[in-house]
């Protein structure tokens, strides 16, 4: 190895490469690990060094060299690579390995617009000092390499254009806790923060991506998923689309209850026009979902729900599959089919399921979620009303189609609406 190589430091100055320094860092990272060879990592990385190389690039080269050695026979290289990555991450965030005091860090990040001002409004400097005493920065060293890369890519507060990172994992955990418990009584909230921090940082509980990446920032995203109820009017459909764009940009996952939209061919304004059906509007929602990423963290995602008795259900069940054309498929959302006891009863008894457009059967859609006895009464009443447009299909055929699509796509879910209401706090 040519020891006369010049390296460019983070402050722009140059100096001769210090191989002993690299060896000491590797020695530190390998402490307590089994079946890892520092020499192997050094050999693999040294051949990639060149005159004028930046110290940051040296560090990334060493990390990659360690990661490339991860195997079933030598799994501990994942921890070697992770420790090196944590070292590098802290140098990028703080300019040094040791993290700063929590209060100083938060004050700086609030001033720079990276953290929510509420942190400094809700907590005193003394409370931040207490929170600082809860933090165990050594817990960073328990991460695997894959976990560090996930943190770096998705969860840590950063500039997603330049890649500049502003924090390390333990600050993430303690500040999420601080934000979540900020409105709790002052005499008890620090205890909650400590217990929550300990549980999250030791992986006893996990948090959804929008909470990990959004809470503590000016975006203030406290909900990981947002449910949007869509009505049967253009105003409601457009409001739904607008809400989707807003919440996707705020990092939330989307649930759309869109079963109220009337079926293809239904009259509009007393027959002045006929309805284009659900699919064009589902496409509209899909475009809204994919219009922006979840705050740069990941692509927007949505699950759209409709009732099994919707007149268009046979066309809706196949929206996700790879057959058909783009004109009659909406593949970039997931779907949930809403079912209740009556549908299962018809299946078990070998009966039919009658399909309706929600616009033709007043009160049926609301009763489907609110009152199962009333739903059954209205459903059988509308089945016997010859003036209402309907379609009968054998229950076994409809359930078979649903299960076939569910098996082939893996992304069609079942919501038992009666159980949702009797077995949840909502």
What function would you assign to each model-found segment?
Residues 1-426:
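Extended catalytic cores of very large enzyme megasubunits
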């Amino acid at each position: 190895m040519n020891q006369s190589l010049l390296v460019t430091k983070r402050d722009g100055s140059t100096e001769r490469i210090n191989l002993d320094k690299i060896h000491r860092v590797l020695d530190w990272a390998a402490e307590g690990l089994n079946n890892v060879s520092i020499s192997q990592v050094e050999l693999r990385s040294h051949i990639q060094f060149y005159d004028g190389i930046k110290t940051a690039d040296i560090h990334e080269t060493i990390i990659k060299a360690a990661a490339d050695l991860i195997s079933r026979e030598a799994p501990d290289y994942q921890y070697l690579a992770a420790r090196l990555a944590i070292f590098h991450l802290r140098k990028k965030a703080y300019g040094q390995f040791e993290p700063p005091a929590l209060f100083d860090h938060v004050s700086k990040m609030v001033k720079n617009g990276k953290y929510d001002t509420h942190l400094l409004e809700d907590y005193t400097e003394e409370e931040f000092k207490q929170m600082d005493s809860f933090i165990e920065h050594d817990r960073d060293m328990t991460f695997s390499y894959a976990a560090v890369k996930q943190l770096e890519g998705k969860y840590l507060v950063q500039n997603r254009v330049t890649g500049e990172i502003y924090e390390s994992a333990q600050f993430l955990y303690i500040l999420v806790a601080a934000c979540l418990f900020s409105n709790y009584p002052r005499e008890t909230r620090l205890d909650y923060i400590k217990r929550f921090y300990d549980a999250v940082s030791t992986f006893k509980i996990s948090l959804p991506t929008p909470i990990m990446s959004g809470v503590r920032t000016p975006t203030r995203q406290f909900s990981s998923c947002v449910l949007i109820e869509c009505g049967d009017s253009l105003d409601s459909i457009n409001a739904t689309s607008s809400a989707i764009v807003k919440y996707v940009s705020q990092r939330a996952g989307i649930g759309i209850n869109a079963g109220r939209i009337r079926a293809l061919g239904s009259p509009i304004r007393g027959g002045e026009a006929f309805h284009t059906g659900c699919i064009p509007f589902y496409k509209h929602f899909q475009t809204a979902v994919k219009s922006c990423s979840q705050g740069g963290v990941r692509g927007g995602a949505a699950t759209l729900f409709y009732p099994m008795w919707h007149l268009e259900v046979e066309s809706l069940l196949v929206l996700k599959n790879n057959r058909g054309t783009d004109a009659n498929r909406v593949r970039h959302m997931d779907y949930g089919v809403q079912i209740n006891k009556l549908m299962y009863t018809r299946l078990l008894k070998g009966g039919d399921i009658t399909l309706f457009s929600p616009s033709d059967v007043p009160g049926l859609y609301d009763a489907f979620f609110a009152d199962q006895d009333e739903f059954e009464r209205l459903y059988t009443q509308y089945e016997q009303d010859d003036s209402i447009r309907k379609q009968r299909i054998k229950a076994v055929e409809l359930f078979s189609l649903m299960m076939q699509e569910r098996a082939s796509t893996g992304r069609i879910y079942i919501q038992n609406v009666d159980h949702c209401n009797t077995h949840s706090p909502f």
